[in-house]
Amino acid sequence: MKLNISFPATGCQKLIEVDDERKLRTFYEKRMATEVAADALGEEWKGYVVRISGGNDKQGFPMKQGVLTHGRVRLLLSKGHSCYRPRRTGERKRKSVRGCIVDANLSVLNLVIVKKGEKDIPGLTDTTVPRRLGPKRASRIRKLFNLSKEDDVRQYVVRKPLNKEGKKPRTKAPKIQRLVTPRVLQHKRRRIALKKQRTKKNKEEAAEYAKLLAKRMKEAKEKRQEQIAKRRRLSSLRASTSKSESSQK
């Protein structure tokens, strides 16, 4: 079995082949995300602790977290699931994946060093691969250089060198995101002012509408009362005329 071991602190990665079954027994029956002591791999691995991050079987099917089995299963996968990348919007597909429990049928096991041991491992812990790009977000730049809120972040941006033959060497800096500048504060003040204006305008319009509605309702009520009074007058008039006619007879 091959072991693909990575060390995030240095950015290095190393693939080693282990033929001795006894060295691999410590990883068998362990699940993904389990931390295991790597002492069994050899003398130089003494004190190292590794985390099982995944693996592939001999046919190339990947291990999937949460599938509690040794073997292979066919799952209906959609966007957001591991081991699947949708080609079309809303596409789902039934794919073969391997369970998250390690056994002897794996061809590659991925491990991440969580704790460094006593000795250095050549090509893994003794060399450092520099990061290609620095942080872009203002808060992350502050965190990296331990800056306070008063310090100017723009002076601490990690610049990328662009060296071309026959041209002047120059550097390129990323645009800092979430940087608080006077312009940003001005935009914020403007947004708040506009919101206040809208609220005030809505309140005034609502009060005006309520006033108009009350006026219309009052007018309708008066009209209704007039109609009722008119009907009453007419009915009383009819009653009086009918009485006078009956008395004459």
UniProtKB/Swiss-Prot annotation:
<feature type="modified residue" description="Phosphoserine">
    <location>
        <position position="244"/>
    </location>
</feature>
<dbReference type="GO" id="GO:0042593">
    <property type="term" value="P:glucose homeostasis"/>
</dbReference>
<protein>
    <recommendedName>
        <fullName>Small ribosomal subunit protein eS6</fullName>
    </recommendedName>
</protein>
<keyword id="KW-0832">Ubl conjugation</keyword>
<dbReference type="GO" id="GO:0006364">
    <property type="term" value="P:rRNA processing"/>
</dbReference>
<dbReference type="GO" id="GO:0005730">
    <property type="term" value="C:nucleolus"/>
</dbReference>
<keyword id="KW-0539">Nucleus</keyword>
<dbReference type="GO" id="GO:0008284">
    <property type="term" value="P:positive regulation of cell population proliferation"/>
</dbReference>
<dbReference type="GO" id="GO:0000028">
    <property type="term" value="P:ribosomal small subunit assembly"/>
</dbReference>
<dbReference type="GO" id="GO:0005783">
    <property type="term" value="C:endoplasmic reticulum"/>
</dbReference>
<dbReference type="GO" id="GO:0002181">
    <property type="term" value="P:cytoplasmic translation"/>
</dbReference>
<feature type="modified residue" description="ADP-ribosyl glutamic acid">
    <location>
        <position position="35"/>
    </location>
</feature>
<keyword id="KW-0963">Cytoplasm</keyword>
<dbReference type="GO" id="GO:0044297">
    <property type="term" value="C:cell body"/>
</dbReference>
<keyword id="KW-0013">ADP-ribosylation</keyword>
<feature type="modified residue" description="Phosphoserine">
    <location>
        <position position="148"/>
    </location>
</feature>
<dbReference type="GO" id="GO:1990904">
    <property type="term" value="C:ribonucleoprotein complex"/>
</dbReference>
<dbReference type="GO" id="GO:0042274">
    <property type="term" value="P:ribosomal small subunit biogenesis"/>
</dbReference>
<dbReference type="GO" id="GO:0003723">
    <property type="term" value="F:RNA binding"/>
</dbReference>
<dbReference type="GO" id="GO:0032868">
    <property type="term" value="P:response to insulin"/>
</dbReference>
<dbReference type="InterPro" id="IPR018282">
    <property type="entry name" value="Ribosomal_eS6_CS"/>
</dbReference>
<dbReference type="GO" id="GO:0098982">
    <property type="term" value="C:GABA-ergic synapse"/>
</dbReference>
<dbReference type="GO" id="GO:1903347">
    <property type="term" value="P:negative regulation of bicellular tight junction assembly"/>
</dbReference>
<dbReference type="GO" id="GO:0098793">
    <property type="term" value="C:presynapse"/>
</dbReference>
<keyword id="KW-0689">Ribosomal protein</keyword>
<dbReference type="InterPro" id="IPR014401">
    <property type="entry name" value="Ribosomal_eS6-like"/>
</dbReference>
<dbReference type="GO" id="GO:0005829">
    <property type="term" value="C:cytosol"/>
</dbReference>
<keyword id="KW-0007">Acetylation</keyword>
<dbReference type="GO" id="GO:0030425">
    <property type="term" value="C:dendrite"/>
</dbReference>
<dbReference type="GO" id="GO:0032040">
    <property type="term" value="C:small-subunit processome"/>
</dbReference>
<feature type="compositionally biased region" description="Basic and acidic residues">
    <location>
        <begin position="217"/>
        <end position="229"/>
    </location>
</feature>
<dbReference type="InterPro" id="IPR001377">
    <property type="entry name" value="Ribosomal_eS6"/>
</dbReference>
<dbReference type="Pfam" id="PF01092">
    <property type="entry name" value="Ribosomal_S6e"/>
</dbReference>
<comment type="similarity">
    <text>Belongs to the eukaryotic ribosomal protein eS6 family.</text>
</comment>
<keyword id="KW-0379">Hydroxylation</keyword>
<dbReference type="GO" id="GO:0003735">
    <property type="term" value="F:structural constituent of ribosome"/>
</dbReference>
<comment type="subunit">
    <text>Component of the small ribosomal subunit. Part of the small subunit (SSU) processome, composed of more than 70 proteins and the RNA chaperone small nucleolar RNA (snoRNA) U3.</text>
</comment>
<feature type="modified residue" description="Phosphoserine">
    <location>
        <position position="240"/>
    </location>
</feature>
<dbReference type="GO" id="GO:0022626">
    <property type="term" value="C:cytosolic ribosome"/>
</dbReference>
<feature type="modified residue" description="Phosphoserine; by RPS6KA1, RPS6KA3, DAPK1 and PASK">
    <location>
        <position position="236"/>
    </location>
</feature>
<dbReference type="GO" id="GO:0019901">
    <property type="term" value="F:protein kinase binding"/>
</dbReference>
<dbReference type="GO" id="GO:0043065">
    <property type="term" value="P:positive regulation of apoptotic process"/>
</dbReference>
